[in-house]
Amino acid sequence: MLYPTPIAKLIDSYSKLPGIGIKTATRLAFYTIGMSADDVNEFAKNLLSAKRELTYCSICGRLTDDDPCSICTDSTRDQTTILVLEDSRDVAAMENIQEYHGLYHVLHGLISPMNGISPDDINLKSLMTRLMDSEVSEVIVATNATADGEATSMYLSRLLKPAGIKVTRLARGLAVGADIEYADEVTLLRAIENRTEL
């Protein structure tokens, strides 16, 4: 169906979001048009503000509005342990269980030979720099239980073990193919408590 240009552009914008097909984009566009002017202005303001004010922590790579982030600058956290995650959303999931008190490192992706993503394409270089300049004795690999997550964890294990750093992996409370951000808090707690050495 042919829509007026402003609606067509809005549909196109929404359809660029992950998991949003043309039907959902159309629904969102029409819903947005039906919102009050104040709500639309607030939505647009918040979207622009998030894009403008957020950055990645120069230490851990987590999405933050401070650099370095509040976790990296918290001296009460365990400085000897780093939990390595694929995405900033995974940090939020781990923080919600309130049982892990170490540091984080966000990779912004996983090694994926099938997709042409090599170790140089993810945030590994800064992890290696952190490990050389710190007192870290354990790295917990908390990548998703997928082929790419496994490839990344094995790569990290082979890279870090010769340096004398203990490398562990979250326990298998997480289902194969499951994303950490969608796991419930009890599952995440059990996974971190029962992590295994690689």
Swiss-Prot record:
Residue spans, zinc finger C4-type: 57-72
Domain of life assignment: Bacteria
This protein's UniProt keywords: DNA damage, DNA recombination, DNA repair, Metal-binding, Zinc, Zinc-finger
UniProt key word Metal-binding: yes
Example GO molecular function: DNA binding
Domain Toprim: residue ranges: 80-175
Record's keyword annotation contains DNA repair: yes
Record-level GO BP terms: DNA recombination; DNA repair
InterPro entries: DNA_Rcmb_RecR, Rcmb_RecR, Rcmb_RecR_Znf, TOPRIM_dom, TOPRIM_RecR
Pfam family, one: RecR_HhH
Family statement drawn from the similarity comment of this UniProt entry: Belongs to the RecR family.
Protein role: May play a role in DNA repair. It seems to be involved in an RecBC-independent recombinational process of DNA repair. It may act with RecF and RecO.
Protein name per Swiss-Prot or TrEMBL: Recombination protein RecR
Organism, scientific name: Streptococcus pneumoniae (strain ATCC 700669 / Spain 23F-1)
